[in-house]
Amino acid sequence: MSKKSKGKILRVIGPVVDVQFEEGDLPDIYDALVVINPQTGKKLVLEVEQLIGDNAVRTVALDTTDGLMRGLEVENTGEPIKVPVGKGALGRMFNVIGEPIDGKEDEIKDVEYWPIHKAPPSITEQSTSVEILETGIKVIDLLAPFPKGGKIGFFGGAGVGKTVLVMELIRNIAIEHHGFSMFAGVGERTREGNELYLDMQEAEVLDNTVLVFGQMNEPPGARFRVALTALTMAEYFRDVEGRDVLLFIDNIFRFVQAGSEVSALLGRMPSAVGYQPTLATDMGELQERITSTKKGSITSVQAIYVPADDITDPAPATTFTHLDATVVLSRRRAALGLYPAVDPLDSTSKMLDPNIIGQEHYEVARGVQEILQRYKDLQDIIAILGMEELSEEDKLIVQRARKIERFLSQPVHVAEKFSNIPGKYVPINETIRGFKEILEGKYDDLPEMAFYMVGTIDEAVEKAKQLQKK
């Protein structure tokens, strides 16, 4: 920890500020410096990123630098950015430096202050036990089950439903599991953050959640560090309270994007596709801290925007290596109205192993994937020659596959006001039973529309009766 000292602003280049100190007073890397912005009268936090010689440091501002000028006095706090952690933070909304931004007058009580930069837990502290986290979303629980204390990526281009799925998971964890969730809004739309806050207030799940935002309009420094702020809050509940916590990051691509902006401003030579040369290190520093220890776990769900739907782009490709499960959202399924638009063939999980999930679940999941793959292979023949040219066996496969595709959809609670269909939470054993019975041919006589946007298989049977009456 460096000593407290004072310096002066030397240069301001957008969000990058150079500060000069007296001989022997240099701050450490990642120390927080504070300057009062004369234009707003508010304190602005700068984080030290580089030592540039001549007793000067290069810092990144965590808020706008409009109004700063050369010669302004800067104070070194002598420690990294510290944010409030603990029960008192639940139900509140913060910015990157841990200041409440929800407009509430109440003071934050019952909290400690932890630095956002920490070493990950050592190998001896980490836990390796394997357990499934039930989400209540059929397509995920069946084909890409989430490991408790693992990392899950939601891959998808713009507008395929990543944020809606993240919001549904927060709701399900809070209401069905009574768990705590931390949400980091990284470089996404402020409007979406506002909607999330209001929806959570309405669903009465806000008291179990902490929201931390560094949105699109904020400088790259704030967007680059906001995920660490939320992670630090999650670490408190894991390490001190011994809880299983969920950490939602929307969107991890914006974290990489902000890192790329910061890197360029700090004068580093860009690497592949213009990304920062430190891409793997930046990602590793964040991801290695998201883990299970012997005290508790952090399960992380990360929405990952795929630029131009190119999965080989360095940002999504670097994220892939850290994940235990990948949920790929498909534009084709979204276009067909099959929500959640999860691609059942591209989505994978390391948990899909008979030794972990049991033989029955494994066989049903593989049976569903097999029949959907066969249907995909037959689609070219159907497009050219029509259904009539198929063998009876293939016709049956197509019929069952179309029912399975529709049964993989389900109404979500957070979209009730748009769809007017009440949301459904489906327990994992009901999910397995439903798909097993479809594969066995028990419902070959029911119309495929009966399986669309329902919860359990019993609801599909009931819907079929309603359709027959019409």
UniProtKB/Swiss-Prot annotation:
Transmembrane segments: none annotated. Keywords: ATP synthesis, ATP-binding, Cell inner membrane, Cell membrane, CF(1), Hydrogen ion transport, Ion transport, Membrane, Nucleotide-binding, Translocase, Transport. It comes from the Bacteria. It comes from Thermosipho africanus (strain TCF52B). GO terms for molecular function: ATP binding; ATP hydrolysis activity; proton-transporting ATP synthase activity, rotational mechanism. ATP binds at residues 156-163. GO terms for cellular component: plasma membrane; proton-transporting ATP synthase complex. Its EC number is 7.1.2.2. This is ATP synthase subunit beta. Disulfide bonds: none annotated. The keyword Acyltransferase does not apply. Pfam families: ATP-synt_ab, ATP-synt_ab_N, ATP-synt_VA_C. Gene3D superfamilies: 2.40.10.170, Bovine Mitochondrial F1-atpase, Atp Synthase Beta Chain, Chain D, domain 3, P-loop containing nucleotide triphosphate hydrolases.
